[in-house]
Amino acid sequence: MPLTHLNEENQPKMVDIGDKETTERIALASGRISMNKEAYDAIINHGVKKGPVLQTAIIAGIMAAKKTSELIPMCHPIMLNGVDIDILEEKETCSFKLYARVKTQAKTGVEMEALMSVSIGLLTIYDMVKVIDKSMTISGVMLEHKSGGKSGDYNAKK
């Protein structure tokens, strides 16, 4: 399959989506941040001096989805219909799993917006808690699902 972001001279270009059909597009991405028990408990018990960590991560994730095209060079700026973020507490592993669902009616998908949302949400958690645990790890950032568009639906293998 040829790369669509290169022109005839092998130089970068933004793909022309003008002739594509506007359809509903949805993307769901996820990722995890793991930390020590002290950091996990501080988040759960609202004991982080910088403020409410999980709520701040949700806001950061929403903001990131809206700014994706400003940071990813070939990503088209698109109007988002909604960004919904859910953070699951995983007490046994002292980790949090963040899910971002992004929805639009557009000529291109929102996979990058969902992935950006997850990444920035997790980085925000890291930033707010690094004073307690600098060894936190972010892992498994991935596209779980996408629907709409010419390529159809995608579901990650479990």
UniProtKB/Swiss-Prot annotation:
GO biological-process terms attached to the record: Mo-molybdopterin cofactor biosynthetic process
Binding site for substrate: M74, C75, H76, M112, E113
MF GO annotations: cyclic pyranopterin monophosphate synthase activity
Catalytically driven reaction(s): (8S)-3',8-cyclo-7,8-dihydroguanosine 5'-triphosphate = cyclic pyranopterin phosphate + diphosphate
Keyword set, alphabetical order: Lyase, Molybdenum cofactor biosynthesis
Enzyme type, top EC level: lyase
Listed InterPro entries: MoaC (IPR023045), MoaC_bact/euk (IPR047594), MoaC_sf (IPR036522), MoCo_biosynth_MoaA/MoaC (IPR050105), Mopterin_CF_biosynth-C_dom (IPR002820)
Pathway annotation: Cofactor biosynthesis; molybdopterin biosynthesis
Tree of life domain: Bacteria
EC assignment: 4.6.1.17
Disulfide cysteine pairs (residue numbers): none
Active-site residues from the entry: D127
Coiled coil: none
Subunit structure: Homohexamer; trimer of dimers.
Family: Belongs to the MoaC family.
PANTHER family for the chain: MOLYBDOPTERIN COFACTOR SYNTHESIS PROTEIN A
Biological role stated in the UniProt entry: Catalyzes the conversion of (8S)-3',8-cyclo-7,8-dihydroguanosine 5'-triphosphate to cyclic pyranopterin monophosphate (cPMP).
Protein name: Cyclic pyranopterin monophosphate synthase
Species of origin: Helicobacter pylori (strain J99 / ATCC 700824) (Campylobacter pylori J99)
Lineage: Bacteria, Pseudomonadati, Campylobacterota, Epsilonproteobacteria, Campylobacterales
Gene: moaC
